[in-house]
């Protein structure tokens, strides 16, 4: 039972946070009140720009130099954090309050062993001495369920999966047993089973230690599944606060209802995700001629388990070391077809081989064996570098996972969209190129005035539209979508999914949709393929696989998806 009689552990009152910019002062958080009780798990939900992360940075006193707390109070365990000295705050961070950041790889030092990074925190806060710090670090790795902790102690971040890196960040955050843990989007980019394992691990450890947790997320399903109370933020203000059991069943604010509507859930259609009053996508369909557009036959991709590949050795002018170990099979003899106008979902956990498969189908990666047949031509036999210059490249395009990372920061939106046209198209600059770019922008719903902006001047949804416009610029027959909505807010995701569905119908394209989110796959795909350890374990129509799964692994994926009460 929550401690509601005593004062809250964290008490935020009338907090206002401002940032100084070239265009004047921007208020990121305005007069908010939030409290966290001892032992409570509080969720703060909202879209990008709502102020939820800025609030957490203000609590930790790690605001950007341009930011400042303009008004209000932040009290932690009876201490006024606004007036605390920098030395006292540095001492409290890690020992009394700690934070899990959104990107685990960015939060870790890439050139320092993970075990040493845990030791740094223990030694900084005098939780260990040199004589026993290694033993304590290994014990903490064991607590966060890192397999073979003695071995992983010596690993660098790049040698670990995303899920393992997140566990290391959790280990560092909980090493000194703080009273308060702030988790800022701790599962973004993780597959559903890893997400479930990470969240259950965090809550298990915090409950064991009687800690309070603040979960910052845009995933309402996550908040519903793991939080006692939920705070909803919009444009820097708190618009609703209520117990999680209440807020999702009877949301009082229109913005909360909008977020609920946009969240994929069992039984929902693409149209259901849009705001009321928005026009429905085109209902046109494409008839297949019976021949597969893309046929994958017994496709295999192998990597050496140690040393360097022959290709790398040739590139660096070295001799590849001999190894007696069997190579690792990332993709192990899979076969499937994509018909014209069809959307095929390729799902599975991280490391299952789905992205490797999509990269080979896109001809960005050469297969070890097997065939990739595009409309009767075996393009798998053509080296990836050579294929990039062939006319057939125009027929297959890709929308990448992260709309920010996939755009050149030095290119304007127009330059990014027209890049494939300049490389492989028949329009060469001038007014014709601008007209074609504006046509594509209109097609994906990107306002013309944004074409001359750079990626950092665009929102996540706008960058996603640029990526889609670039992918369809050459009128491809097949578009490979690699987790295209994983990093987007739910309302933006809903719009992008409907846009993709409309474009497929209008332009007659086929999709290979790579994802770990089965709710999203069900909305967009006709056929679903489930991969595990490089092999296909189940496939069939979307309704068949997702409503009546035959394989235990598929059932585990479906069960791991958190979603708000229907």
Feature roles, as predicted:
Residues 2-8, 147-153, 244-295, 304-322, ...:
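Short catalytic/signature loops enriched in Gly
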Residues 177, 475:
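Conserved catalytic motifs of ABC-family nucleotide-binding domains
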Residues 69-80, 370-381, 392:
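Conserved ABC transporter NBD signature motif
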């Amino acid at each position: 039972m929550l401690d509601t009689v005593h004062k809250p552990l964290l008490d935020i009152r009338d907090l206002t946070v401002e940032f100084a910019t070239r265009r004047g002062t921007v208020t990121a958080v305005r007069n908010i009140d939030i409290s966290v009780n001892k032992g409570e798990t509080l969720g703060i939900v909202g879209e990008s720009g709502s102020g939820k992360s800025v609030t957490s940075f203000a609590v930790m006193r790690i605001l950007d130099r341009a930011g400042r707390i303009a008004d209000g109070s932040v009290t932690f365990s009876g201490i006024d954090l606004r007036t605390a000295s920098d030395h006292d705050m540095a001492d409290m961070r890690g020992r009394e309050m700690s934070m899990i950041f959104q990107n685990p790889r960015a939060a870790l030092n890439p050139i320092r062993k993970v075990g040493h990074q845990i030791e740094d925190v223990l030694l900084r806060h005098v939780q260990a001495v040199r004589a026993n710090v290694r033993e304590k670090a290994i014990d903490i790795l064991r607590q966060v369920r890192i397999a073979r902790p003695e071995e992983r102690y010596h690993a660098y971040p790049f040698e670990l999966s995303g899920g393992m890196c997140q566990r290391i960040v959790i280990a560092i955050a909980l090493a000194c047993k703080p009273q308060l843990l702030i988790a800022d989007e701790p599962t973004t980019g993780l597959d559903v089973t890893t997400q479930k394992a990470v969240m259950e691990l965090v809550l298990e450890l915090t409950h064991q230690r009687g800690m309070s947790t603040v979960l910052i997320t845009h995933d309402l399903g996550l908040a519903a599944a793991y939080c006692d109370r939920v705070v909803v933020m919009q444009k820097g203000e708190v618009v609703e606060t209520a117990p999680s059991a209440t807020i999702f069943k009877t949301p009082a604010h229109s913005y909360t209802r909008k977020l609920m509507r946009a969240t994929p859930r069992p039984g929902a259609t693409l149209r259901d995700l849009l705001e009321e009053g928005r026009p429905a996508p085109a209902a046109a369909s494409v008839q297949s001629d019976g021949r597969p557009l893309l046929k994958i036959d017994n496709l295999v991709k192998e990597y050496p388990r140690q040393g360097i590949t022959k290709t790398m050795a040739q590139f660096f002018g070295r001799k590849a070391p001999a190894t007696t170990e069997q190579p690792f099979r990332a993709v192990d003899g899979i076969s499937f077809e994509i018909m014209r106008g069809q959307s095929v979902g390729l799902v599975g956990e991280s490391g299952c081989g789905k992205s490797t498969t999509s990269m080979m189908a896109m001809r960005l990666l050469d297969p070890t064996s097997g065939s990739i047949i595009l409309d009767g031509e075996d393009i798998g036999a053509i080296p990836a570098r050579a294929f990039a210059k062939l006319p057939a490249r125009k027929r297959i395009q890709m929308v990448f996972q992260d709309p920010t990372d996939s755009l050149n920061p030095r290119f304007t939106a127009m330059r990014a969209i027209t890049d494939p046209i300049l490389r492989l198209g028949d329009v060469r600059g001038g007014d014709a190129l601008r007209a074609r770019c504006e046509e594509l922008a209109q097609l994906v719903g990107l306002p013309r005035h944004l074409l001359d902006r750079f990626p950092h001047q665009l929102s996540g949804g706008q960058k996603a539209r640029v990526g889609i416009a670039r992918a369809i610029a050459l009128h491809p027959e097949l578009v490979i979508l690699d987790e295209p909505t994983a990093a987007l807010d739910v309302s933006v995701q809903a719009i992008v999914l409907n846009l993709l569905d409309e474009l497929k119908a209008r332009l007659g394209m086929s999709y290979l949709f790579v994802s770990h989110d089965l709710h999203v796959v069900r909305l967009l795909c006709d056929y679903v393929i489930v991969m595990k350890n490089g092999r296909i374990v189940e496939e069939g129509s979307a309704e068949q696989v997702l409503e009546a799964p035959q394989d235990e692994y598929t059932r585990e994926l479906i069960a791991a998806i958190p979603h708000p009460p229907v």
